[in-house]
């Protein structure tokens, strides 16, 4: 059953602050302050503080604008907690397959869109951008605009909605997002298998061919496997696992995720081929079947690693390293898009997160 926008189930967190946020953006533009969007603050470690800037907080701009379970579409305000959205969807047996990290309940859906982070199901279900249907935001001109829509099949043209995914708040202030959602799998089971470090790449490659696989990780000398589907399909896939497998649960599976890791030195993200050798120093966890790796290392230890594959996340006991923006083709494209959509530089630039020698 579709639930209307103002039904009682949503009233306790239904806050529309569009007018106030638009006023705040236009006031900052008028005095020449750089605008820094903020949601739950769970990803503030990506940025450094800027002089002559103003932070505009969207965390009170929250609630479900509308939710139509039969149509597999939900529109949600940017300040809504991911945990809240997940709970609402679960009541109808649905979920957001991109699984953006919720940082122990702090993360908002607007921050998830801005960061573009997706969970362990990324290789199997797609990333967050694949589930964005439409976005309402405040442009660098100060205008409120809508892009995309609330239907699966959208009009042709350049998709400014998905362009916001991973833009880190550099292209405008997100107000609300229309998302495609899916029914939850009939059955989900988790398993863990002990693995020596020297065997992890080959074991991940072997497990990666399994049917029903929706998550494949490595953490704390264990390979963590998630299988999803019908009871029959999951049972068949389970028999392909080694006999020494042990049952696990969702808490076990979530260990080693970006929102759970606390580095002693500096936390870095490595993206590459799953079969790449374990030559990166400070490896603490792997995801996406080995294509995503988390390193706890000093930047001085990473000189031998291809810098185009490394992204800074946050620091532990060490100071923040000297970082640069992307210098490759993607970086140049980011700069061109920023110049086209925010020529006056009213919103913050994409953060410098790359380490170049």
Ranges and model annotations:
Residues 49-51, 59, 104, 244-357:
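Conserved glycine-rich FAD pyrophosphate-binding loop
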Residues 37, 214-220, 284-288:
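Short beta-strand
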Residues 83-85, 198-203, 231-239, 275-281, ...:
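Short, conserved charged micro-motifs
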Residues 114, 133-264:
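C-terminal substrate-binding/cap subdomain adjacent to the FAD-binding core in PCMH-type
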Residues 7-37, 58-104, 117-150, 185-193, ...:
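N-terminal glycine-rich flavin-associated loop
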Residues 45:
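Basic, alpha-helical nucleic-acid-binding regions used in initiation and control of genome expression
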Residues 12-13, 74-76, 189-194, 221-240, ...:
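Short cationic amphipathic helices and targeting signals
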């Amino acid at each position: 059953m579709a639930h209307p926008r103002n039904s009682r189930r949503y009233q306790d967190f239904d806050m529309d602050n569009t007018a106030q946020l638009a006023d705040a953006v236009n006031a900052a533009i008028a005095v020449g302050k750089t605008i820094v969007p903020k949601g739950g603050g769970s990803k503030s470690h990506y940025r450094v503080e800027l002089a002559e800037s103003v932070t505009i907080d969207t965390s009170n701009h929250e609630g479900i604008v509308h939710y139509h379970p039969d149509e597999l579409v939900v529109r949600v305000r940017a300040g809504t907690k991911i945990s809240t959205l997940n709970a609402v969807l679960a009541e109808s047996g649905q979920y957001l397959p991109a699984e953006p990290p919720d940082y122990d309940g702090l993360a908002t859906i607007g921050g998830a869109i801005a960061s573009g982070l997706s969970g362990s199901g990324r290789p199997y279900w797609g990333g967050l951008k694949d589930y964005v249907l439409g976005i309402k935001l405040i442009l660098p001109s100060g205008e409120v605009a809508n892009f995309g829509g609330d239907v699966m099949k959208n009009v042709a043209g350049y998709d400014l909605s998905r362009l916001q995914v991973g833009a880190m708040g550099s292209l405008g202030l997100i107000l609300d997002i229309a998302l495609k959602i899916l029914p939850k799998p009939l059955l989900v089971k988790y398993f863990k298998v002990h693995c020596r470090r020297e065997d992890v790449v080959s074991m991940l490659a072997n497990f990666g061919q399994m049917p029903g696989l929706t998550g494949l990780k490595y953490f704390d000398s264990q390979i963590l496997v998630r299988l999803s589907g019908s009871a029959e399909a999951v049972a068949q896939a389970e028999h392909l696992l080694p006999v020494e497998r042990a049952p696990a649960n969702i808490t076990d599976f979530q260990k080693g995720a970006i929102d759970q890791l606390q580095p002693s030195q500096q936390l870095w993200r490595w993206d590459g081929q799953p079969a790449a050798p374990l030559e990166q120093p400070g490896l603490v966890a792997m995801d996406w079947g080995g294509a995503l790796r988390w390193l706890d290392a000093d930047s001085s230890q990473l000189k031998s690693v291809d810098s185009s594959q490394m992204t800074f996340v946050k620091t532990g006991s060490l100071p923040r390293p000297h970082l640069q923006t992307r210098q490759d083709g993607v970086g140049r494209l980011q700069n061109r898009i920023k110049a086209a959509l925010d020529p006056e530089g009213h919103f913050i630039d994409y953060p410098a997160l790359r380490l170049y020698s």
